[in-house]
From Swiss-Prot:
Annotated function: Binds 16S rRNA, required for the assembly of 30S particles.
Protein name: Small ribosomal subunit protein uS14c
Annotated source species: Calycanthus floridus var. glaucus
Main location group: plastid
Cellular component terms per the entry's GO annotation: chloroplast; small ribosomal subunit
Gene name, Swiss-Prot/TrEMBL: rps14
Alphabetized UniProt keyword annotations: Chloroplast, Plastid, Ribonucleoprotein, Ribosomal protein, RNA-binding, rRNA-binding
Subcellular location: Plastid, Chloroplast
Amino acid sequence: MARKGLIQRERKRQKLEQKYHLIRRSPKKEIGKVSSLSDKWKIHGKLQSPPRNSAPTRLHRRCFLTGRPRANYRDFGLSGHILREKVHACLLPGATRSSW
């Protein structure tokens, strides 16, 4: 189980990303339209003004049950070992068992 502080930090990042989504998106569109280098630097400065944690690349997908940030399956929202336990317990329909 992940520490509660890490999960709260991730939720805070998700809220920041939603808040600054439009502010980040508009300068990215402008950079492609502008041809002069000085204008691109000005737009780049605007892009750096939002907080660092509002960038979507700083988000992790976490396991729905344990909060584990690695080895997640997007289709289920679960980490690998939890997914395996659920499949062996026949709680996920359509998934085939495997052993390793």
